[in-house]
């Protein structure tokens, strides 16, 4: 699994929110996420992800090579791996993959209900109304949803509106 969720990053927004997500997945409270704990993170974000993708992600974001993802590495995962947009083909492919993660019904648009569902899976407590507000910040065409072009633009602006 490559870059996955700039929408989550922009919705979480603050370091405190990212810490809460980290703590939710750090089941044993040791301040680091193991491979098994990472599997749960990935399952919440992408139920169809393969075990190989978990291993790849661990290698990519375990910056100090100790076999765990600590809070700093988790933040990097959100800032670089999950939220990073760009111009090369892999980045566009990664963005498309991230977009599809939220587009649960596959209609090419992320609705407030879809965003709410993903946020809920991540343990975030936000209402559908909160998600509508988040979407309205990047909804250029005013249809109440985020299409892929709006998603790309949001990500090229650093994950926020």
Swiss-Prot record:
Keyword Plastid: no
Induction comment from the UniProt entry of this chain: By rain-, wind-, and touch (thigmomorphogenesis), dark, heat and cold treatments, hydrogen peroxide, ABA and auxin.
Keywords attached to this entry: Calcium, Metal-binding, Repeat
PROSITE patterns reported for this sequence: EF_HAND_1, EF_HAND_2
UniProt-annotated binding residues for Ca(2+) 1: 26, 28, 30, 32, 37
Sequence positions that bind Ca(2+) 3: 103, 105, 107, 109, 114
Pfam families tied to this protein: EF-hand_7
GO biological process, one term: response to metal ion
Tissue specificity annotation: Expressed in seed coat, seedling radical, cotyledons, hypocotyl, shoot apex and elongating root. Expressed in the vasculature of cotyledons, leaves and roots. Highly expressed in guard cells, trichomes and hydathodes. Expressed in inflorescence stem branch points, silique abscission zone, young and mature styles and stigmatic papillae, mature anthers and developing seed.
Protein name: Calcium-binding protein CML24
Native source species: Arabidopsis thaliana (Mouse-ear cress)
Binding site for Ca(2+) 2: 62, 64, 66, 73
Binding, Ca(2+) 4: 139, 141, 143, 145, 150
InterPro entries, A to Z: EF-hand-dom_pair (IPR011992), EF_Hand_1_Ca_BS (IPR018247), EF_hand_dom (IPR002048), EF_hand_pair_protein_CML-like (IPR039647)
PANTHER family documented for this protein: EF-HAND CALCIUM-BINDING DOMAIN CONTAINING PROTEIN
Role description: Calcium-binding protein that may positively regulate abscisic acid (ABA) inhibition of germination and seedling development. May be required for photoperiod-induced flowering and function in ion homeostasis.
């Amino acid at each position: 699994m490559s870059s996955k969720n700039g929408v989550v990053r922009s919705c979480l927004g603050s370091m405190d929110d990212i810490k809460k997500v980290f703590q939710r997945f750090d089941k044993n409270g040791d301040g680091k996420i193991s491979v098994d704990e990472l599997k749960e993170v990935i399952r919440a974000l992408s139920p169809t992800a393969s075990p190989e993708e978990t291993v790849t992600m661990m290698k990519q974001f375990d910056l100090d090579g100790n076999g765990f993802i600590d809070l700093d590495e988790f933040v990097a995962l959100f800032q670089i791996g999950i939220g990073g947009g760009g111009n090369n083909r892999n980045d566009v492919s990664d963005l498309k993959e991230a977009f599809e993660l939220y587009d649960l019904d596959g209609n090419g648009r992320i609705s407030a209900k879809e965003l709410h569902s993903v946020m809920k899976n991540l343990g975030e407590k936000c209402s559908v109304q909160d998600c509508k507000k988040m979407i309205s910040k990047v909804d250029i065409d005013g249809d109440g949803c985020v299409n892929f072009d709006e998603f790309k633009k949001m990500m090229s602006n650093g994950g926020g509106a």
